[in-house]
Each structure stands twice: as structure tokens, then as C-alpha cells.
Amino acid sequence: MENRPNVLFVTLDSVRHDHTSVHGYERDTTPSLRRIADRPDGATFDSCIAHGKHTPKSSASILTGIYPSVHRFGYEDNTLDPDIETIAERFSKAGYRTVCVSNNAFVSEETGFGRGFDDIVVVPKEPLDIIQTAG
């Protein structure tokens, strides 16, 4: 078995960078993310910029690494061009097991955002439902 790192890729939608404790906010707003980032093998990125003002276009850019004007998601329709590779597809081709845990309806096979994930777990938006789903 190959010795390679586990990769946990976390994105947050509609969250202010300067209001997260992982980035120094005085209130402990993101304790779990801070613990992960503070590990010797943890990392955070301070220069991440949304490439669209709407979640779908930004999410497409995050998952593909290309600008909305190139991937065109959300312009004509809400389907990612099958010729555009996602980060999950790249990890899958490299032999990683890929799992997406999301409450975002756009992460699906129908939109193309789900391509490359071995499993997609849809997490409910209500806290009690999240506990029941995880349990």
C-alpha cells in the first residue's frame, strides 16, 4: 500500500474568513476546523477568492479550478461540461477513495459536480437530522 496523505477538503459557503477562529477571530466559531488546521499536517489557505457571486458558479470554480467564464456552469444550464475535469476525478484517478459530504443540492451526478466521488452523502440541514444521518 502506498504511503500518501489523507486529504480533507473543506469549503464553506457564505462564511466570512475574518469571523472564523481558524483565522484568528477572538470567538471560537470554528473549533473543529482550527483543530484540524493546527495539526502538523494541517493547512489553511488565506487567499481564496470566490469567483462568482452565486454558490453554483463559485462551487463549479472550486471543484474545477477554472473561471466561470470558462466552465460556463449556470450560464445556459446547470450542468458541468463533461469534458471539464473535477478535483474529485483527479483524486480518483490517482487512486484515492473520494467521498463528498454536503447539504448542497448542486453536488450530484445530474449537475456534474458529483463526478469522481465514490460516495455522496447528503446531509440534512436541520441539526437533529444531521445527527441521525451520521449515527
Model-assigned labels for residue ranges:
Residues 1-135:
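Catalytic domains that recognize anionic headgroups
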